[in-house]
Amino acid sequence: MVSAQLHFLCLLTLYLTCGYGEEGKFSGPLKPMTFSIFEGQEPSQVIFQFKTNPPAVTFELTGETDGIFKIEKDGLLYHTRALDRETRAVHHLQLAALDSHGAIVDGPVPITIEVKDINDNRPTFLQSKYEGSVRQNSRPGKPFMYVNATDLDDPATPNGQLFYQIVIQLPQINDVMYFQIDSKTGAISLTPEGSQELDPVKNPSYNLVVSVKDMGGQSENSFSDTTYVDISIRENIWKAPEPVEIRENSTDPHPIKITQVQWNDPGAQYSLVNKEKLSPFPFSIDQEGNIYVTQALDREEKNSHVFFATAKDENGKPLAYPLEIYVKVIDINDNPPTCLSPVTVFEVQENEPLGNSIGIFEAHDMDEANNINSILKYKLVDQTPKVPSDGLFLIGEYEGKVQLSKQSLKKQDSPQYNLSIEVSDVDFKTLCYIQVNVIDINDQIPIFETSNYGSKTLSEDTAIGSTILIIQATDADEPFTGSSKILYKIVQGDTEGRLEVVTDPTTNAGYVKIKKPLDFETQPVSSIVFQAENPEPLVKGIEYNASSFASFELIVTDVNEVPVFPQRIFQANVSEDAAVGSRVGNVTARDPEGLTVSYSLKGNMRGWLKIDSVTGEIFSAAPLDRETESVYRVQVVATEVGGSSLSSTADFHLVLTDVNDNPPRLAKDYTGLFFCHPLSAPGSLIFEVTDDDQQSLRRPKFTFALGREGLQSDWEVSKINGTHARLSTRHTRFEEQVYNIPIRINDGGQPPMEGTVFLPVTFCQCVEGSCFRPAGRQDGIPTVGMAVGILLTTFLVIGIILAVVFIRMRKDKVENPQSPENKPLRS
C-alpha cells in the first residue's frame, strides 16, 4: 500500500511540475485513446490526464467502468481497484467534457482499457483421474485418449500456454516408455515400443502420472498440476488370418469369399494393397472385412499371392499396421508332360556290352513338383530302324535311363536309331524323341604333342582367372564324338586346387588358368602333371599310357605381404572388478614371409589395456568400469619386425560384465517436494530410485526403509513396485520448515548394495496450490524509514510548488484588476 501511495504522489508531482498547459506522455487533449494496463496492479494508479478548454469544467466517465475507473474534475483518469483480466479483458468507456451546468461540450470519445495478462492462475486438470483403454498393437502416435487442463490466463501469452508430460509410468519394464503424450494437446498414444510389446495377458493395465505446466513448461516459476491416468490394455482382434488355400482353375461362380479381417471397432473402412502390382488384381474386400477371390487362379502362372488388408478411419488415416494375407494356389493336373528339346541325342560305341547305360532321358511337367500330378512315367513305343532287330533299347519306367537290351550295335547295320518315348502323368500323354548315334569304338588314346611344357615363373599375386599355359593333345578316333573329345585334369602337384584346365570343344586345346590365389609361402615350386582322357570309355584292352600325360613346373615368386590375422574381430569377456594386470585376452597374427610380428594397441583412449608386444597377450592396465563403457574397443596393430615393417590391424572388443558396485540413488532431483501448511489431512509423495549397475531382464527389486530411528512416528515409507515408493505423513502436526527425510534403499543384488538418500520435504504456506516463500530484504528496495522520508520530502516539494502558484496568482490579480476573476458578481 505504501509503494502504491508513493507511486501516486510521484505522478502527481510530475503533473504539477510539468504544468497543465503542456501536453506530454501523461496528459493530453480529449480524444479517443487506448491504454494497456497489467492486471493485479495496486489501486489508485493514474492512467492519464485529459485536458480541455472552457467552458468545460469537469468530465463524465461512462461505460464498462465496473466501479473501478474514476476521473477527477481536473481530468485525472485512474483505477480504484486492481484489474482482473479473467473478469474482463477489455473495458470500453466513454468520456465527455461538461460545462458548469452539466451539459456536454466535448465528446463523448471512446476510451479503451486493455487489461494485460500476468501469470496469476495455475493450470488445473478437468478431472483428478482419467480412465482409458487401448488395443494392443495399435498404431503408434495415434491418440486413444486425451487429458485436458484449463488455465484462466491469456492463451495468447506464455502465461496460458500449457505443457503436458508423463511423469511416471507404472509398470515401466526395462526403462521403456510404452506411452507418450502430445505436450500441447494432451493426446496420449502408444510409442513404437508400446505398439510392439503391450500384451493384456502379461500386464492388463498401466498407471500414468501426468503433469501440466503453464509458461509452455519453459520457466522454473511456472505453475503446475498433476492427474492420474488408468489405462487398460485390450486384446487386438486386428490380426492376420491363417494362410488361405485355393484350388487353381476353379469353375465355381466368382467372386468367392476366402477369408475375413475385422477391425476392433465398427466403422472402419477396409481396402486391399496389391503388393506385387498384379494386373488385374484378382482379390477384393467389402466393408464387412470379407475378402474375395474374383477370378480363377492359375498355379503355373503364380503359385502364391501375398497382399495386405488395411483399415482406415473416416478421414482416410490408417488405424493400425496393414495385415499380410497369404494365399496358396493348390495344384490340379492341368498340364501335360513336355519334352525338354525336340530331339535328345545320345552316343553309343560299337560293340558296347549288353546293359550298358546310354544316357538319362528327362521330360518336364509344369504341375507342382513332388506331387502326383507331376510324376512322369516313360515308355519306349517305337524304334526306327528295326535292324538288326526291334527292341534293341529299353528305358527305365520312372528314372528314364536308356540301355542296350539285346546286343551290341554295329555302325554298318545303322549309324543312327530314332526312338519314340511316351511320357505320361495321371491324365496326359506326350511323345518325345531320342536319337542314338552309333560311333566308332574308342580304341585310340589322346596323345600330348609334348610330354614336358617346361617351367614358368609367376608372382604370387597373379590375378585369378589368368591363363598361364596352353596344352594340346590329339585323338585319332571319330571327330566330334565322345571318343575323340579330350578332357584334361591335373593329377599331381596341385593338391590345393589352385589351377584348372578348360578344354576348347573345337580344337581340344587345354587352357590352364589360375583358380585360387598362388602362395609362395606354402608352395613356391609345383611340379604339375596333366592327364588327357576321353569322356567315352576305352575299349577293352586299350589303356591310357605315358603319351596321355605331360609335365609342367610352376615357380611362384614372393611378394611382401602384411601380417595376417586369423579373424577380423577378437572378443573377450571379463568382470569389471578384474585386478589391474589381469590377462583379459590374446590375439595372434602370422607374417606370410615368416618374419617376427610385433604387437601394439591403437585407440586405447582410456588406457585400460596393455599388450605384450611379443606374444599378443592383452592385460588390464587400469581399473575397469562397466558403467563408464560396457564394451571397450581397441585396435591391435601387427607389424613386421625387419623387412618393410608392413602392418595390419584387427579389432579387439572387451565386454565388461557387471558387478553390483553402485548403491541406489534417487532417479532425479526432488528439491521441489512440498506440503501446504497446515496439513488438513495426512499426505503422501511418490519418488523413484535407480542405480548405475546393469539391470537384468527382470525388473529391479529395490526395498525401502526409513533411514533413522524415531522417524516412524511421523513418517512412513511404502514400496509401490521395484523402482517407486511412497513417502507418507502419519499425522498433520508438522511445523512450517524443511524436513530432510533419510530413506535407506537396498538393491537386492549379489552382493547387495545399500545407500541412504535424503528427500527434502518443505511444509509451507500455499498460494493457489503452490508454495509461497516471502522474499527477504533486497538491495535497492526502500525500507519503511526510507519510505517515510521520501513521503515527507514529496509533501515539502508540493508545498513549495503550491506556494509559488498562489504567489503568482496573487501577483496576476494585482497587475490585472479588471480580469474576469476580479470583477464583482452582478446582482
UniProtKB/Swiss-Prot annotation:
Spans within the Cytoplasmic topological domain: 808-827
GO biological process, one term: marginal zone B cell differentiation
Keyword flag Transit peptide: no
SMART domains: CA (SM00112)
GO CC field: basolateral plasma membrane; cell junction; cell surface; nucleoplasm; plasma membrane
Domain Cadherin: 29-127, 128-243, 244-339, 340-448, 449-565, 566-666, 667-776
Glycosylation sites: N148, N249, N418, N545, N573, N586, N721
Transmembrane segments: 787-807
Signal peptide residues on this chain, from the entry's feature table: 1-25
Subcellular location per the Swiss-Prot or TrEMBL entry: Cell membrane
Keyword list, A-Z: Calcium, Cell adhesion, Cell membrane, Glycoprotein, Membrane, Metal-binding, Repeat, Signal, Transmembrane, Transmembrane helix, Transport
Pfam families: Cadherin
Extracellular side of membrane: 26-786
Expression sites (tissue/organ): Highest expression is found in intestine with lower expression in spleen, bone marrow, lung and testis. No expression detected in liver, kidney, heart, brain or skeletal muscle. Expressed in precursor B-cells and myeloid cells.
Superkingdom of the source species: Eukaryota
Domains: entry comment: Three calcium ions are usually bound at the interface of each cadherin domain and rigidify the connections, imparting a strong curvature to the full-length ectodomain.
Protein name in the entry: Cadherin-17
Taxonomic source organism: Mus musculus (Mouse)
